[in-house]
């Protein structure tokens, strides 16, 4: 998701400013990228941030990424008013994989309400989740930035889900000039 929806303008700016730099870019699940930085196999990762970050990893939030409950336009909950979380929980859901930070964010919301979502399938790819929702198989939680006419947002009064996107580095690792330059672009995005 980040690689398709957040990084392109930053990568464009970076490659224009530093055309001589050869980038080593790997598109990984956030949890895998976190592990790569933690174990020194990557110096910087732009990821969905973990709810808690353990030393020696340092996390910097760049974007708030609001999440919406979504269904297909023809789903029984589409267009209904006064929908409760319990109503949503009773319908089949497609969730991000159980090991993902986004899954844990949504799961905690249901647990706080004493509910269990009816998760019938999962995948780590947001675009696949959107497709499954759009054809009416299930509801899900998607980043607001992905919403279009293929899916309908469900109004759930009093419920707001947000995940944080940003970058992580290893505190005990010396970063390359290229990594520091890219961090400066990311910091400019967050207003630093």
Model-derived segments and their meaning:
Residues 49-50, 73, 143-146, 165, ...:
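Short secondary-structure boundary segments
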Residues 155-192:
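A late-sequence structural motif
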Residues 58-68, 139-144, 151-165:
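Short beta-strand->loop
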Residues 29-42, 48, 99-152:
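Hydrophobic hinge/microswitch elements
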Residues 1-54, 119-123:
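Central regulatory/effector-binding core of bacterial HTH transcription factors
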Residues 54-67, 71-93, 177-179:
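Flexible hinge/capping segments at coil-to-helix
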Residues 48, 78, 91-113, 175-184, ...:
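Secondary-structure junction motif
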Residues 15, 51, 58-61, 77, ...:
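Short secondary-structure boundary/capping segments
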């Amino acid at each position: 998701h980040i690689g398709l929806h957040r990084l392109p303008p930053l990568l464009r700016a970076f490659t224009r400013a530093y055309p001589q730099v050869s980038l080593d870019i790997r598109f990984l699940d956030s949890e895998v990228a976190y592990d790569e930085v933690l174990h020194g196999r990557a110096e910087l990762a732009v990821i969905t941030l973990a709810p808690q970050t353990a030393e020696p990893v340092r996390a910097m939030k760049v974007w708030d990424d609001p999440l919406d409950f979504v269904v297909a336009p023809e789903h029984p909950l589409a267009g209904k008013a006064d929908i409760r979380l319990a109503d949503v929980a009773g319908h089949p859901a497609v969730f991000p994989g159980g090991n993902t930070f986004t899954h844990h964010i949504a799961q905690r919301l249901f647990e706080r309400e004493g509910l269990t979502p009816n998760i019938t399938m999962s995948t780590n790819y947001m675009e696949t989740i959107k497709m499954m929702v759009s054809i009416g198989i299930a509801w899900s939680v998607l980043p607001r930035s992905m919403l279009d006419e293929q899916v309908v947002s469900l109004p759930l009064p009093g419920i707001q889900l947000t995940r944080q996107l940003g970058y992580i580095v290893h505190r005990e690792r010396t970063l390359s000039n290229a990594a520091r330059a890219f961090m400066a672009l990311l910091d400019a995005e967050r207003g630093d």
